[in-house]
């Protein structure tokens, strides 16, 4: 079994729905919000998990963790990215092959829309501003610990060396970063970053905090990241994940203060009243399409 397929299979065995433990400091589960639109968040996440596992039958990259990271990036953008916009870049032809039946397609879309709505609610700017210290984002992540890795190795799915590369949140971050590539126009380098403005540095740091989840904890780049954030101690995996989730929340707020500039709309100059009408009638504009003007 390939590494991607092994990740997909193992994710179903070692996932938490959601990963965030509601009694940890700062964590806020779906049931803590009385305005939550979904009365059964666990069932909604189970449906999302089952949907992604079907997608993974055609593209083993599309396991729930990766897809959830991808959807999270679209929810954290400065504008609303619709399901119709993101399906093809996210899934290629896997979605159309998996859900070819119209009824199946409608049900799958409802499941994805529900997950997207939950992510948008978690990243609602007003709610974030109400309590900047609250960890609202609840990512779908497979928990990789020594027992989970050992189980994969003993089942013969991967080697010990391959299992050692599996880390909680890694594929979620990979999905998030892929969405920023696929929707590069919605994740542009801000002018502040190009000009050396400190605000641009903050944007880069926030994205870097998410990217750090995808790095090998033994790598030099991760060690440099950990040293910058945790001066005298090695961070736990939970601490790194929490920082990434807070970074996503801050990115959502960053876009509120720094929306990309839209290109100016070009308005064609109207012909003069005595000019020939643009419709080709041969009459003057004032006696043709310019009458109303």
For the regions a protein language model found, what residue spans apply to each?
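Acidic/negatively charged segments and metal-coordination signatures
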Residues: 2-293
